[in-house]
Amino acid sequence: MKFFIDTANLSQIQEAQDLGVLDGVTTNPSLMAKEGITGKEAILKHYTNICTIVEGDVSAEVIATDFEGIVREGEELAALHPQIVVKVPMIKDGIKAIKYFTDKGIRTNCTLVFSAGQALLAAKAGATYVSPFIGRLDDMSADGLSLIEEIRLIYDNYNFETQILAASVRHTMHILECAKIGADVITAPLSAITGLLKHPLTDSGLAQFLADAKKLG
């Protein structure tokens, strides 16, 4: 399983990178705004800065929702750096654009996926990644993890190469359940990733070891 961090915060990206387990980054306009990154030039420069920290894929999202606009923005993003993956919304023109990008050799991440049917269309169009939002489905009393299972079954049935990138991951149990189901990638906040480090028995065991070590002189 690949680990992506879902943030535009450079210090958090660096911290995750320093752990040695980071495979990539996902961003979106909301995360950019949260970091106070505004204006086209600043946003593009920020994407480039992220690419200098990590060695893996960096998903950069288009703002446009029409085919021509998505293509224009996507081509500009893809030209920034070889690590950039163009993040495209699951809409009609988005699917058309994903097929266009696929034919041009530009990698894509189909975002805002909430059904297996949407994931199937994204794979047919040649998306590199598909991003089902499990946390948002859970918020609606739906089962986000079941969606991952459905997509995994469909993709395995037809040997689709599109990778399942579980998004809207809220906590460590989401990560673990996605790993059991067979998601190819999870993207999560730093707190969820570092949360995997923690267990009360680890803390108490370490405290005991350190106490015993002091007795040794």
Residue ranges with predicted function:
Residues 20-24, 80-84, 100-109, 124-131, ...:
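Glycine-enriched alpha-helix->loop->beta-strand junction motifs that scaffold or abut catalytic
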Residues 3-5, 9-13, 19-21, 27-100, ...:
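Active-site beta->alpha loop and helix N-cap motifs at the rims of alpha/beta catalytic domains
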Residues 11-19, 69-73, 97, 115-125, ...:
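Catalytic cores of alpha/beta
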Residues 28, 86, 122, 178, ...:
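Conserved, mostly hydrophobic/aromatic
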Residues 112-147, 154:
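Histidine/lysine/aspartate-rich catalytic loop segments that bind and position anionic ligands
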Residues 29-33, 112, 128-140, 183-202:
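Glycine-rich phosphate-binding active-site loops on the catalytic face of alpha/beta enzymes
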